[in-house]
Amino acid sequence: MSDGDYDYLIKFLALGDSGVGKTSVLYQYTDGKFNSKFITTVGIDFREKRVVYRASGPDGATGRGQRIHLQLWDTAGQERFRSLTTAFFRDAMGFLLLFDLTNEQSFLNVRNWISQLQMHAYCENPDIVLCGNKSDLEDQRVVKEEEAIALAEKYGIPYFETSAANGTNISQAIEMLLDLIMKRMERCVDKSWIPEGVVRSNGHASTDQLSEEKEKGACGC
């Protein structure tokens, strides 16, 4: 796909404590490589990838492929950058929330990150996928899988155990997040909730046209 040759531009935000592997996960997804020498993200950075999304119907059949331009925003996890990070929450449509399976405090802080999202995202119930990263470091693991699953179930969000080192479940986690977003857009008659500048259609309904449907009903956010 050439520049501008897509149906939707969608922004995802990766967040979590410093050192959980956000940059490495996004780099593995976009470039298929692992770089162990990344320095700590200062402020905000992003990567991009083009994908084709095909929704599955109740009968299992897939519809026409939607061309998606993903912007994957990488945020600083340190507290001193928190005000800058939260300023980006409202413009993102989906959130990849990571913790480090070898760092219990990063897991305990997941609740704080979700609280921040509930306060600052485009709605109180945004689409989130929880990732326990560094699953390849099994001998250093301190967070049990059942603990992470229980937390994800408490908030009603999907959970994946990922590894930036070998790529385990990274594509699956991001594809799940994209699927949640596309299904949310499909079922919501009122598209006014969509963060401005995040979703754009080329050759289909414009965001202005989508906003004109406000009087027809609201999205259950």
Curated annotation (Swiss-Prot):
It is a lipid-anchor. Keywords: Acetylation, Disease variant, Disulfide bond, Endosome, Exocytosis, GTP-binding, Hydrolase, Lipoprotein, Lysosome, Membrane, Methylation, Nucleotide-binding, Phosphoprotein, Prenylation. Regulated by guanine nucleotide exchange factors (GEFs) which promote the exchange of bound GDP for free GTP, GTPase activating proteins (GAPs) which increase the GTP hydrolysis activity, and GDP dissociation inhibitors which inhibit the dissociation of the nucleotide from the GTPase. Activated by GEFs such as DENND10. Changing residue 23 to N: GDP-locked. Abolishes interaction with UNC13D and localization to lysosomes. Increases interaction with DENND10. Disrupts late endocytic pathway homeostasis. A motif (Effector region) lies at residues 38-46. It comes from the Eukaryota. The modification Phosphoserine is found at residue 2. It is found in: Membrane; Melanosome; Late endosome; Lysosome. Small GTPase which cycles between active GTP-bound and inactive GDP-bound states. In its active state, binds to a variety of effector proteins to regulate homeostasis of late endocytic pathway, including endosomal positioning, maturation and secretion. Plays a role in cytotoxic granule exocytosis in lymphocytes. Required for both granule maturation and granule docking and priming at the immunologic synapse. This is Ras-related protein Rab-27A. It comes from Homo sapiens. The lineage of its organism: Eukaryota, Metazoa, Chordata, Craniata, Vertebrata.
